[in-house]
Protein backbone atom coordinates (compact mmCIF):
# COMPACT_ATOMS: atom_id res chain seq x y z
CA UNK A 1 0.00 0.00 0.00
CA UNK A 2 1.30 3.43 -0.89
CA UNK A 3 2.12 6.05 1.75
CA UNK A 4 -0.65 8.52 0.75
CA UNK A 5 -3.35 5.84 0.91
CA UNK A 6 -1.94 4.37 4.15
CA UNK A 7 -2.06 7.83 5.69
CA UNK A 8 -5.64 8.36 4.55
CA UNK A 9 -6.78 5.01 5.93
CA UNK A 10 -5.14 5.72 9.27
CA UNK A 11 -6.80 9.11 9.46
CA UNK A 12 -10.14 7.60 8.46
CA UNK A 13 -9.91 5.09 11.28
CA UNK A 14 -9.05 7.84 13.76
CA UNK A 15 -12.08 9.86 12.70
CA UNK A 16 -14.49 7.19 13.88
CA UNK A 17 -12.87 6.51 17.25
CA UNK A 18 -14.94 8.29 19.92
CA UNK A 19 -12.79 10.23 22.38
CA UNK A 20 -13.78 10.12 26.09
CA UNK A 21 -14.74 13.34 27.82
CA UNK A 22 -17.24 15.12 30.02
CA UNK A 23 -18.11 18.19 28.00
CA UNK A 24 -21.64 19.55 28.14
CA UNK A 25 -23.96 19.30 25.15
CA UNK A 26 -23.44 23.05 24.57
CA UNK A 27 -19.67 22.64 24.58
CA UNK A 28 -19.93 19.69 22.22
CA UNK A 29 -22.19 21.63 19.88
CA UNK A 30 -19.77 24.57 19.92
CA UNK A 31 -16.83 22.30 19.23
CA UNK A 32 -18.76 20.59 16.45
CA UNK A 33 -19.57 23.94 14.84
CA UNK A 34 -15.95 25.03 15.08
CA UNK A 35 -14.80 21.75 13.52
CA UNK A 36 -17.30 22.19 10.71
CA UNK A 37 -16.07 25.73 10.07
CA UNK A 38 -12.46 24.57 10.02
CA UNK A 39 -13.38 21.73 7.67
CA UNK A 40 -15.07 24.16 5.31
CA UNK A 41 -11.97 26.36 5.33
CA UNK A 42 -9.81 23.34 4.56
CA UNK A 43 -12.03 22.18 1.69
CA UNK A 44 -12.97 25.46 0.05
CA UNK A 45 -9.99 25.42 -2.31
CA UNK A 46 -9.99 22.26 -4.34
CA UNK A 47 -8.11 21.59 -7.57
CA UNK A 48 -10.02 21.84 -10.82
CA UNK A 49 -10.40 18.68 -12.87
CA UNK A 50 -10.05 19.40 -16.58
CA UNK A 51 -11.15 16.73 -19.04
CA UNK A 52 -8.08 16.57 -21.28
CA UNK A 53 -9.47 16.37 -24.82
CA UNK A 54 -12.63 15.14 -23.08
CA UNK A 55 -12.68 11.69 -21.52
CA UNK A 56 -9.92 10.72 -23.94
CA UNK A 57 -8.87 7.67 -21.94
CA UNK A 58 -12.16 6.03 -22.86
CA UNK A 59 -13.45 7.56 -26.10
CA UNK A 60 -11.93 9.09 -29.23
CA UNK A 61 -10.61 12.48 -28.19
CA UNK A 62 -12.15 15.83 -29.04
CA UNK A 63 -15.63 14.53 -29.77
CA UNK A 64 -18.90 15.69 -28.24
CA UNK A 65 -19.27 12.22 -26.80
CA UNK A 66 -15.86 12.42 -25.10
CA UNK A 67 -16.63 15.85 -23.67
CA UNK A 68 -20.05 14.69 -22.44
CA UNK A 69 -18.54 11.64 -20.76
CA UNK A 70 -15.89 13.76 -19.04
CA UNK A 71 -18.68 15.95 -17.65
CA UNK A 72 -20.67 12.90 -16.52
CA UNK A 73 -17.55 11.70 -14.71
CA UNK A 74 -17.22 15.00 -12.86
CA UNK A 75 -15.02 17.32 -14.95
CA UNK A 76 -15.19 21.01 -14.09
CA UNK A 77 -13.86 22.00 -17.52
CA UNK A 78 -13.37 20.25 -20.84
CA UNK A 79 -10.50 21.07 -23.15
CA UNK A 80 -11.06 21.60 -26.89
CA UNK A 81 -7.82 22.07 -28.83
CA UNK A 82 -8.60 24.39 -31.72
CA UNK A 83 -7.41 24.30 -35.33
CA UNK A 84 -8.87 26.06 -38.38
CA UNK A 85 -10.51 24.64 -41.48
CA UNK A 86 -9.94 25.94 -45.00
CA UNK A 87 -13.05 28.11 -44.72
CA UNK A 88 -12.11 29.52 -41.33
CA UNK A 89 -14.12 27.45 -38.88
CA UNK A 90 -12.58 26.38 -35.57
CA UNK A 91 -12.80 22.66 -34.95
CA UNK A 92 -11.64 20.50 -32.06
CA UNK A 93 -8.54 18.52 -33.03
CA UNK A 94 -5.27 18.04 -31.19
CA UNK A 95 -3.18 18.93 -34.24
CA UNK A 96 -3.66 20.47 -37.69
CA UNK A 97 -2.60 17.06 -39.03
CA UNK A 98 -5.72 14.91 -38.63
CA UNK A 99 -4.31 11.66 -39.99
CA UNK A 100 -3.96 10.02 -36.57
CA UNK A 101 -7.30 11.03 -35.08
CA UNK A 102 -9.74 10.59 -37.97
CA UNK A 103 -10.51 8.06 -40.70
CA UNK A 104 -9.35 10.47 -43.42
CA UNK A 105 -6.58 8.13 -44.65
CA UNK A 106 -9.17 5.49 -45.52
CA UNK A 107 -11.31 7.87 -47.57
CA UNK A 108 -10.44 7.56 -51.28
CA UNK A 109 -12.13 10.84 -52.14
CA UNK A 110 -9.48 12.66 -50.10
CA UNK A 111 -6.41 10.64 -51.09
CA UNK A 112 -5.01 13.50 -53.16
CA UNK A 113 -4.96 15.76 -50.09
CA UNK A 114 -2.13 13.83 -48.45
CA UNK A 115 0.98 15.98 -48.34
CA UNK A 116 3.98 17.06 -46.30
CA UNK A 117 3.66 20.27 -44.30
CA UNK A 118 5.98 22.03 -41.89
CA UNK A 119 4.36 22.73 -38.54
CA UNK A 120 6.47 24.70 -36.07
CA UNK A 121 9.68 23.79 -37.84
CA UNK A 122 8.99 20.06 -38.13
CA UNK A 123 8.03 18.40 -41.42
CA UNK A 124 5.20 15.89 -41.18
CA UNK A 125 3.16 13.93 -43.68
CA UNK A 126 -0.57 13.59 -43.47
CA UNK A 127 -3.84 15.40 -44.00
CA UNK A 128 -4.23 18.93 -42.67
CA UNK A 129 -7.41 20.57 -41.44
CA UNK A 130 -6.66 23.75 -43.38
CA UNK A 131 -7.00 21.79 -46.64
CA UNK A 132 -10.61 20.83 -45.86
CA UNK A 133 -13.83 22.81 -45.64
CA UNK A 134 -16.01 22.32 -42.59
CA UNK A 135 -18.52 20.42 -44.74
CA UNK A 136 -15.76 17.98 -45.71
CA UNK A 137 -14.54 17.67 -42.12
CA UNK A 138 -18.07 16.76 -41.08
CA UNK A 139 -17.97 13.68 -43.32
CA UNK A 140 -15.01 12.29 -41.35
CA UNK A 141 -15.20 10.17 -38.22
CA UNK A 142 -12.95 10.26 -35.17
CA UNK A 143 -10.75 7.43 -33.99
CA UNK A 144 -8.70 6.62 -30.90
CA UNK A 145 -5.02 7.32 -31.64
CA UNK A 146 -3.59 5.23 -28.77
CA UNK A 147 -3.64 1.50 -29.37
CA UNK A 148 -3.89 0.51 -25.70
CA UNK A 149 -7.18 2.37 -25.32
CA UNK A 150 -10.67 1.21 -26.40
CA UNK A 151 -10.98 0.99 -30.17
CA UNK A 152 -14.61 -0.07 -30.48
CA UNK A 153 -15.83 3.51 -30.83
CA UNK A 154 -13.68 4.29 -33.86
CA UNK A 155 -15.71 5.58 -36.78
CA UNK A 156 -18.74 6.45 -34.65
CA UNK A 157 -18.37 10.14 -33.84
CA UNK A 158 -18.05 13.33 -35.87
CA UNK A 159 -15.61 16.22 -35.46
CA UNK A 160 -17.20 19.12 -33.53
CA UNK A 161 -16.88 22.84 -34.03
CA UNK A 162 -16.09 25.16 -31.14
CA UNK A 163 -19.68 26.40 -31.20
CA UNK A 164 -20.96 22.84 -30.81
CA UNK A 165 -18.69 22.28 -27.83
CA UNK A 166 -19.94 25.48 -26.20
CA UNK A 167 -23.56 24.47 -26.78
CA UNK A 168 -22.93 21.06 -25.22
CA UNK A 169 -21.27 22.57 -22.15
CA UNK A 170 -24.08 25.08 -21.66
CA UNK A 171 -26.67 22.33 -21.91
CA UNK A 172 -24.78 20.14 -19.45
CA UNK A 173 -24.45 23.06 -17.03
CA UNK A 174 -28.25 23.31 -16.91
CA UNK A 175 -28.70 19.55 -16.66
CA UNK A 176 -26.16 19.11 -13.87
CA UNK A 177 -26.95 22.26 -11.93
CA UNK A 178 -23.28 23.16 -11.61
CA UNK A 179 -20.90 25.42 -13.49
CA UNK A 180 -19.01 23.64 -16.27
CA UNK A 181 -16.56 25.45 -18.50
CA UNK A 182 -14.31 25.18 -21.52
CA UNK A 183 -10.53 25.39 -21.63
CA UNK A 184 -9.66 25.94 -25.31
CA UNK A 185 -6.10 25.86 -26.59
CA UNK A 186 -5.03 27.89 -29.59
CA UNK A 187 -2.94 25.30 -31.43
CA UNK A 188 0.13 26.52 -33.32
CA UNK A 189 -0.86 30.20 -33.59
CA UNK A 190 2.19 31.15 -35.69
CA UNK A 191 1.42 28.34 -38.15
CA UNK A 192 -2.21 29.42 -38.49
CA UNK A 193 -1.23 33.08 -38.84
CA UNK A 194 1.04 32.17 -41.77
CA UNK A 195 -1.88 30.38 -43.43
CA UNK A 196 -4.05 33.47 -43.16
CA UNK A 197 -6.25 31.66 -40.65
CA UNK A 198 -5.50 33.35 -37.32
CA UNK A 199 -7.26 31.74 -34.39
CA UNK A 200 -7.58 34.54 -31.87
CA UNK A 201 -10.30 36.67 -33.47
CA UNK A 202 -12.37 33.62 -34.37
CA UNK A 203 -12.15 32.33 -30.81
CA UNK A 204 -13.13 35.65 -29.26
CA UNK A 205 -16.04 36.01 -31.70
CA UNK A 206 -17.40 32.62 -30.63
CA UNK A 207 -16.98 33.49 -26.95
CA UNK A 208 -18.71 36.83 -27.47
CA UNK A 209 -21.64 35.14 -29.21
CA UNK A 210 -21.88 32.74 -26.26
CA UNK A 211 -21.79 35.59 -23.72
CA UNK A 212 -18.47 34.27 -22.42
CA UNK A 213 -16.02 37.00 -23.43
CA UNK A 214 -15.38 38.33 -19.91
CA UNK A 215 -13.27 37.68 -16.82
CA UNK A 216 -15.90 35.73 -14.91
CA UNK A 217 -16.89 33.43 -17.76
CA UNK A 218 -16.26 29.70 -17.24
CA UNK A 219 -13.39 29.89 -19.72
CA UNK A 220 -9.61 29.64 -19.74
CA UNK A 221 -7.63 30.18 -22.95
CA UNK A 222 -4.28 28.41 -23.11
CA UNK A 223 -1.35 28.43 -25.51
CA UNK A 224 2.25 27.23 -25.73
CA UNK A 225 3.14 30.44 -27.56
CA UNK A 226 3.61 33.72 -25.73
CA UNK A 227 2.93 36.47 -28.27
CA UNK A 228 -0.62 35.36 -28.99
CA UNK A 229 -1.44 35.32 -25.26
CA UNK A 230 -0.02 38.82 -24.90
CA UNK A 231 -2.15 39.92 -27.86
CA UNK A 232 -5.22 38.25 -26.36
CA UNK A 233 -4.60 39.96 -23.02
CA UNK A 234 -5.14 43.29 -24.79
CA UNK A 235 -8.37 42.13 -26.42
CA UNK A 236 -10.17 40.18 -23.69
CA UNK A 237 -10.42 39.81 -19.93
CA UNK A 238 -10.92 36.03 -20.21
CA UNK A 239 -8.38 34.20 -18.06
CA UNK A 240 -5.24 33.19 -19.98
CA UNK A 241 -2.84 30.35 -19.21
CA UNK A 242 0.75 30.05 -20.44
CA UNK A 243 1.57 26.43 -21.24
CA UNK A 244 5.13 25.30 -20.53
CA UNK A 245 6.54 22.28 -22.33
CA UNK A 246 9.74 20.23 -22.39
CA UNK A 247 10.82 17.50 -24.76
CA UNK A 248 11.78 14.73 -22.34
CA UNK A 249 13.37 13.88 -18.98
CA UNK A 250 17.05 12.97 -18.74
CA UNK A 251 18.30 10.05 -16.65
CA UNK A 252 19.20 12.40 -13.79
CA UNK A 253 15.76 14.01 -13.72
CA UNK A 254 16.71 17.23 -15.52
CA UNK A 255 14.42 18.23 -18.35
CA UNK A 256 15.54 17.89 -21.96
CA UNK A 257 14.97 20.70 -24.45
CA UNK A 258 15.46 19.57 -28.04
CA UNK A 259 14.68 21.69 -31.09
CA UNK A 260 12.19 22.47 -32.44
CA UNK A 261 10.27 21.77 -29.22
CA UNK A 262 12.68 23.58 -26.91
CA UNK A 263 10.90 26.93 -26.78
CA UNK A 264 7.64 28.61 -27.83
CA UNK A 265 7.70 28.66 -31.62
CA UNK A 266 6.98 32.38 -31.77
CA UNK A 267 10.30 32.87 -29.97
CA UNK A 268 12.05 30.75 -32.60
CA UNK A 269 10.74 32.82 -35.51
CA UNK A 270 11.16 36.16 -33.74
CA UNK A 271 14.87 36.42 -34.57
CA UNK A 272 15.43 38.11 -31.20
CA UNK A 273 18.70 36.93 -29.61
CA UNK A 274 17.32 37.16 -26.08
CA UNK A 275 14.42 34.84 -26.98
CA UNK A 276 16.56 32.45 -29.02
CA UNK A 277 18.83 32.06 -25.98
CA UNK A 278 15.92 30.79 -23.86
CA UNK A 279 14.07 27.50 -23.56
CA UNK A 280 10.62 26.83 -22.13
CA UNK A 281 12.41 26.43 -18.81
CA UNK A 282 12.90 30.19 -18.60
CA UNK A 283 9.18 30.58 -17.99
CA UNK A 284 9.53 28.67 -14.69
CA UNK A 285 12.26 30.95 -13.31
CA UNK A 286 11.30 33.78 -10.97
CA UNK A 287 11.95 36.27 -13.78
CA UNK A 288 9.89 34.22 -16.21
CA UNK A 289 6.98 33.85 -13.79
CA UNK A 290 7.00 37.59 -13.14
CA UNK A 291 6.85 38.15 -16.90
CA UNK A 292 3.98 35.70 -17.38
CA UNK A 293 2.02 37.33 -14.55
CA UNK A 294 1.86 40.52 -16.62
CA UNK A 295 -0.49 38.91 -19.15
CA UNK A 296 -1.74 35.58 -17.79
CA UNK A 297 -3.85 34.22 -14.96
CA UNK A 298 -1.80 31.08 -14.60
CA UNK A 299 0.69 28.60 -15.98
CA UNK A 300 0.09 25.14 -17.41
CA UNK A 301 3.38 23.28 -16.96
CA UNK A 302 4.18 19.72 -17.89
CA UNK A 303 3.95 17.91 -14.57
CA UNK A 304 7.65 16.99 -14.67
CA UNK A 305 8.47 20.61 -13.87
CA UNK A 306 6.81 19.94 -10.50
CA UNK A 307 7.78 16.33 -9.82
CA UNK A 308 10.42 14.91 -12.13
CA UNK A 309 11.65 11.32 -12.39
CA UNK A 310 15.05 9.67 -12.40
CA UNK A 311 16.27 6.33 -13.69
CA UNK A 312 15.55 3.52 -11.22
CA UNK A 313 18.22 0.77 -11.36
CA UNK A 314 15.72 -1.61 -9.79
CA UNK A 315 12.78 -0.51 -11.88
CA UNK A 316 11.04 -2.78 -14.34
CA UNK A 317 8.24 -2.53 -16.81
CA UNK A 318 7.58 -0.24 -19.75
CA UNK A 319 8.00 3.52 -19.96
CA UNK A 320 8.00 5.47 -16.72
CA UNK A 321 7.49 2.32 -14.67
CA UNK A 322 11.29 1.97 -14.93
CA UNK A 323 11.77 5.36 -13.25
CA UNK A 324 11.28 6.69 -9.74
CA UNK A 325 10.26 10.07 -8.43
CA UNK A 326 12.65 12.91 -7.77
CA UNK A 327 12.07 15.40 -4.97
CA UNK A 328 9.29 17.88 -5.79
CA UNK A 329 10.38 21.31 -6.95
CA UNK A 330 9.11 24.58 -5.50
CA UNK A 331 7.47 25.69 -8.77
CA UNK A 332 3.93 25.71 -7.35
CA UNK A 333 4.92 27.88 -4.40
CA UNK A 334 6.92 30.28 -6.56
CA UNK A 335 4.11 30.56 -9.10
CA UNK A 336 1.64 31.30 -6.32
CA UNK A 337 4.01 33.92 -4.94
CA UNK A 338 3.97 35.54 -8.39
CA UNK A 339 0.17 35.59 -8.32
CA UNK A 340 -0.27 32.72 -10.80
CA UNK A 341 -2.43 29.60 -10.62
CA UNK A 342 -0.91 26.27 -11.68
CA UNK A 343 -2.76 23.72 -13.86
CA UNK A 344 -0.48 20.80 -14.73
CA UNK A 345 -0.71 18.25 -17.55
CA UNK A 346 -1.22 15.35 -18.33
CA UNK A 347 -2.44 12.72 -15.86
CA UNK A 348 -3.09 9.24 -17.20
CA UNK A 349 -3.87 5.80 -15.77
CA UNK A 350 -1.78 3.43 -17.87
CA UNK A 351 0.92 1.56 -15.95
CA UNK A 352 3.64 2.61 -18.39
CA UNK A 353 2.96 6.24 -17.49
CA UNK A 354 3.36 5.78 -13.72
CA UNK A 355 6.77 5.90 -12.00
CA UNK A 356 7.43 2.99 -9.66
CA UNK A 357 6.74 5.01 -6.47
CA UNK A 358 3.06 5.11 -7.33
CA UNK A 359 2.86 1.30 -7.10
CA UNK A 360 0.80 1.13 -10.27
CA UNK A 361 -2.03 3.19 -8.76
CA UNK A 362 -2.77 6.51 -10.51
CA UNK A 363 -4.66 7.76 -7.44
CA UNK A 364 -1.31 8.11 -5.70
CA UNK A 365 -0.03 10.48 -8.37
CA UNK A 366 -3.06 12.75 -8.07
CA UNK A 367 -2.81 12.78 -4.28
CA UNK A 368 0.82 13.83 -4.40
CA UNK A 369 0.10 16.74 -6.72
CA UNK A 370 -3.04 17.73 -4.82
CA UNK A 371 -1.09 17.75 -1.56
CA UNK A 372 1.60 19.90 -3.17
CA UNK A 373 -1.04 22.57 -3.77
CA UNK A 374 -1.79 22.22 -7.47
CA UNK A 375 -4.74 24.35 -8.62
CA UNK A 376 -5.87 22.09 -11.44
CA UNK A 377 -5.03 18.95 -13.40
CA UNK A 378 -5.54 17.96 -17.02
CA UNK A 379 -6.65 14.33 -16.98
CA UNK A 380 -7.48 11.74 -19.63
CA UNK A 381 -9.39 9.83 -16.94
CA UNK A 382 -11.69 12.33 -15.24
CA UNK A 383 -13.21 9.79 -12.88
CA UNK A 384 -9.83 8.91 -11.37
CA UNK A 385 -9.01 12.57 -10.83
CA UNK A 386 -12.39 13.14 -9.16
CA UNK A 387 -12.05 10.12 -6.84
CA UNK A 388 -8.61 11.35 -5.78
CA UNK A 389 -10.10 14.78 -5.09
CA UNK A 390 -12.75 13.20 -2.88
CA UNK A 391 -9.95 11.55 -0.92
CA UNK A 392 -8.25 14.92 -0.60
CA UNK A 393 -11.48 16.40 0.77
CA UNK A 394 -11.70 13.56 3.28
CA UNK A 395 -8.11 14.08 4.35
CA UNK A 396 -8.67 17.80 4.85
CA UNK A 397 -11.88 17.21 6.77
CA UNK A 398 -10.15 14.77 9.09
CA UNK A 399 -7.23 17.13 9.56
CA UNK A 400 -9.63 19.95 10.45
CA UNK A 401 -11.37 17.79 13.04
CA UNK A 402 -8.00 16.96 14.55
CA UNK A 403 -7.03 20.64 14.97
Task: Kindly label every feature range from the protein language model.
Residues 22-403:
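Phosphate-group recognition and catalysis centered on beta-loop-alpha active-site segments
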Residues 10-19:
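Bacterial N-terminal signal peptides
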Residues 1-9:
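Bacterial N-terminal signal peptides that target proteins for export
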Amino acid sequence: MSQPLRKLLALSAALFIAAPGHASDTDRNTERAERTERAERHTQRLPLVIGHRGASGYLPEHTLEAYALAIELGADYVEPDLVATKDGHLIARHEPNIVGTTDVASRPEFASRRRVAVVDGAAEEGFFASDFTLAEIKTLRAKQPLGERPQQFNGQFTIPTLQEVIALVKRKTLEKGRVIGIYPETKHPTYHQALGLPLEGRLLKALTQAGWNHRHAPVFIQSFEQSNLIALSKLTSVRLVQLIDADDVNADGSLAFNAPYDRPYDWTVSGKPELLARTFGYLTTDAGLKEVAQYAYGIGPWKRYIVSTVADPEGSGPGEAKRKLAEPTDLIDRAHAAGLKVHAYTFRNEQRRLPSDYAGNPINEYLQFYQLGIDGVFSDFTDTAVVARELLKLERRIAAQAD
